[in-house]
Amino acid sequence: MTDYSKTVNLLESPFPMRGNLAKREPAWLKSWYEQKRYQKLREIAKGRPKFILHDGPPYANGDIHIGHAVNKILKDIIIRSKTQAGFDAPYVPGWDCHGLPIEVMVEKLHGKDMPKARFRELCREYAAEQIARQKKDFIRLGVLGDWDNPYLTMDFKTEADTVRMLGEIYKSGYLYRGAKPVQFCLDCGSSLAEAEVEYKDKVSPAIDVAYPFKNTVALAAAFGLAGIEGKAFAVIWTTTPWTLPASQAVSAGADVVYQLIDTPKGKLVLAKDLAEGALKRYGFSDGIAILAETTGDKLENLHMNHPFLERDIPMLNGEHVTTDAGTGLVHTAPAHGLEDYAVCNKYGIELYNPVNAEGKYISETPRVAGMSVWEANPVILQWPEETGNLLASSKIEHSYAHCWRHKTPLIYRATGQWFVGMDKAGSDGKTLRDKAIKAVDDTEFFPPWGRARLESMIEGRPDWVVSRQRYWGTPMTFFVHKETGELHPNSAELLEKVAQRIEEKGIEAWFSLDKSELLSAEDCEHYDKLPDTMDVWFDSGSTHYSVVKQREELEWPADLYLEGSDQHRGWFQSSMLTGCASSMGRAPYKQLLTHGFVVDQNGRKMSKSIGNVVAPQEVYNEFGADILRLWAASTDYSGELAISKEILKRVTESYRRIRNTLSFLFANLSDFNPIEDAVQQADMVEIDRYALVLARRLQERLAGGYYPRYAFHFAVKDIVSFCSEDLGAFYLDILKDRLYTTKADSRARRSAQTALYHITRSLVLLIAPILCFTGEEAWDIIGGGEEDSVLFHTWHEFPAINEKAEAELVKKWTAIREAREAVTAAIEPLRADKTVGSSLQAEAEITAPEEMAGYLNALGEELRFALLVSKAEVKVGDELAVAAKASDGEKCERCWHYTRDVGAVAGYETVCKRCAENVGGEGETRHYA
């Protein structure tokens, strides 16, 4: 008896269904590194148009977290997809190496008691150790880049070019020194840039304090009264009592309506809109009378006494005064608030700062000298109470600025700092703010809402404090006049000389420099080296100049910057400002892409205390990096990205669908040689030509749309849908009969394999930017072997097809698919009640509208293959309907179809006539399915 199972084309797949990624990925990485894949790619891509994604440098401290992984994976998908789209897309990874967090770690490890040069040396060593750890993890994610030659902000050349960028901004006229209030962290002992500030809720004392008017006659005139009997007070409300010793004025809104109210305390001046709430706070319900009203402009230049110090307090008009809360009058301390500083500066009031760099009151401050501002709060609360000027005291919870590193509250404190001015006219007569806003207009944003966000931040941001009083940072290499504070007149030339030294020896070249090496003896008497270092955001914000402009393989401006949404106020902005403030005069990027933060499945932030942290190391060790990459790509990054074990298991199911599809494709291509066996398109079976159209259209959607627009979640959705619906549930389901049962080298089978070959090559190329390990594993089989790489190839080129013919083909097979779905639905009840086991055990009678019936009948005897039934008949009717029943034929042992011709051919008693022909004759022919 013949064993017909040996006559079917069931081949083993060289692509296993189980990926075993976690174990196999490291070996692939090792092999790619040994083959110098990245370097070979640069040679292959030489001469192509450039695409530059400039890497925003992660900070060189601690292990990478899941947010780092998302960021690097998204960048890698873009680099790979651009490469396959025909660009030369080099990727130079970078690290941010200077700054306080590293100082803090070095102090913890080695203490503080050492020479500063040794301290900086240890900081450099620590940063290098952290970079090595992070680099290993980034490479493990499959991120392709020049890992042997990354950029580091602590590289001597980069440090030198950061100094040169400082020189650019100096020459542009935007740099100035000023004693302005800046956000100051007492734990850092330094000013903070806006990007280093985060807002959290804080409970603060809220007090109403009365300032006695000196001259009630002038006050009466302001309110249009003949006179005022008794005492009168301007009442302020503040949540920072510690600033009261620095109070130098009270501000009123010029257009705000104020009332003079008679109360048991005396006459009080309060904003009309806030008076009722204020009087309730003071417990005044009886004996109240509104005497008069006026506007704030009439109160200007009236004078009061300080509530507990001997100090004259003028009334000013300030644009910052609102009637949202409080009293409508604002106590004004120019040393401790930007708006306070601005209004006092306008009125020529000299700044007084009683708080030192440690956050303690100077010795001249009565009662609180030597106390920290937080310790002094309760003492200061008692002070106006003793003088009878405290009207109310309570607690309030409000959003307050905190240090992003120490999580401690900040203070505004006036210090002598170096600023990049936003509204100062530069050497070209334009302000930096105007230039930056124009640069925003010239930038493309992904997602689009990023434009409004960055624009509003630039419109509202203060001048950029670029100086720091730290040790581990790029120095501000200026010589400053000892008496005037002015910069040396030859600063531009001196900066370049210093930069040349730093290029050779690093920042230590400045710190160890004796000024006599660069200055004349006379200049040495009058000028000192500036001890300040630069804000680390200046370091990273200058990398478009120090890296992109300097490295031969890169081009300025970059095409794309891609970072988390917090970088609108961080790296995106600092890069924008250095680009616009320098001779480049524009943003250093053409596009900005923003991704959200990673949260757990319940939308909560990752937190060790909650126990919901998902570490990338755990994910790639358990699931493989390709699963992490697929998760990152399949999640809409424009919002928060949710991750958990359950979510990753669902992602694994999508991966399995793609992998199983590839395994099937490779099994059925294992005896196919495209050079010898391919069938010309005109000679292909019709459904194979239709499948090629579906595959080509998938490629067009991804290569021509989703990848260039960075819409990776749509790309993943389309790939999975193509594998499960177009291939798995339709084309491959139909194809199995032809692949398995026709003669191995028949046109019918070779036509199918030709289609599968094109589909497989295209599919592997399409998944490769996302599933880089799986893509390369597959390309080893269908490409040029182990030394070849999917990245060495651009998108697949499909056989050309006439547009009109394609449209007709798609229309026809769309109708056939619709009919097939109706047939499948009609058979389902028969399967449910066990009347039939598989659809091949059924017959279908289809009623269809004329056009659809024509398409179905055109397939003739092959219609049953397309519908996966053993027999199909079609008649014309008004609408689609299907009647299904069990076949009365006999099951063919070889093809499993139920027919009435089993055993019709002598010697083939258990198989149908078609199978007898395929086994012993010339083989069947197919035209449609």
Curated annotation (Swiss-Prot):
Pfam family, one: zf-FPG_IleRS
Motif residue range(s): 'HIGH' region: 58-68
SUPFAM superfamilies the UniProt entry points to: Anticodon-binding domain of a subclass of class I aminoacyl-tRNA synthetases (SSF47323), Nucleotidylyl transferase (SSF52374), ValRS/IleRS/LeuRS editing domain (SSF50677)
Record motif 'KMSKS' region, residues: 605-609
Cofactor(s) demanded: Zn(2+)
Location of this chain's protein in the cell: Cytoplasm
Signal peptide annotation: none
Keyword terms: Aminoacyl-tRNA synthetase, ATP-binding, Cytoplasm, Ligase, Metal-binding, Nucleotide-binding, Protein biosynthesis, Zinc
Annotated ATP binding sites: K608
Root EC class: ligase
Family note: Belongs to the class-I aminoacyl-tRNA synthetase family. IleS type 1 subfamily.
HAMAP family the UniProt entry points to: Ile_tRNA_synth_type1 (MF_02002)
Described purpose of this protein according to its UniProt entry: Catalyzes the attachment of isoleucine to tRNA(Ile). As IleRS can inadvertently accommodate and process structurally similar amino acids such as valine, to avoid such errors it has two additional distinct tRNA(Ile)-dependent editing activities. One activity is designated as 'pretransfer' editing and involves the hydrolysis of activated Val-AMP. The other activity is designated 'posttransfer' editing and involves deacylation of mischarged Val-tRNA(Ile).
Domain notes: IleRS has two distinct active sites: one for aminoacylation and one for editing. The misactivated valine is translocated from the active site to the editing site, which sterically excludes the correctly activated isoleucine. The single editing site contains two valyl binding pockets, one specific for each substrate (Val-AMP or Val-tRNA(Ile)).
Name of the protein described by the UniProt record: Isoleucine--tRNA ligase
